[in-house]
Amino acid sequence: YAIMGNIEKFSTVACYGISGAAAVIVGKRIGEGASKEEIYDISWCLLLVSLLIGVIVSAALAALLPTIFIPYLYPLFHLEGLSLRIAATMCVVFIIMMPTKAFDITNITGILRAGGDVRMAFVLDVGSVWLVSVPITALTALVFDAPVALVCLGIQAEGLCKVPLGVWR
């Protein structure tokens, strides 16, 4: 996880940049008295940009996994055999979930908080971890003894519930 955690942090830099920009743009327009419809339109535009950035980052990571990570990065950490396959599997799951992560970061830390809806941002952040990710991960790993890919997907499952709830809000 230490390696994938660093790759994740590096990969989400652009997402947090868009999120910060979204907070400034949305907060400024609200402060200027923009209509609710205009704020929604701006928010959707920013969310689509963040989704696009998530897809671009996913594509870049998908290209880096077989060309840089597996042959050069992972051996620096003496990963081979099973540990190499687990690290690669974790990276693949992260690549698949990256667009939802980008969307969620912008929606929660950018748009909802800038709009003053910190309660919903808190519920989405904390609730999705403790009511979705932790139980799914515990069940897949401890009860069902599922493969690593499914356990990793359980860890990332919070994104699957944040997107529809965030859009609804």
Sequence positions of predicted segments:
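Small-residue-rich hydrophobic transmembrane alpha-helices
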Residues: 1-59, 65, 102-116, 120-121
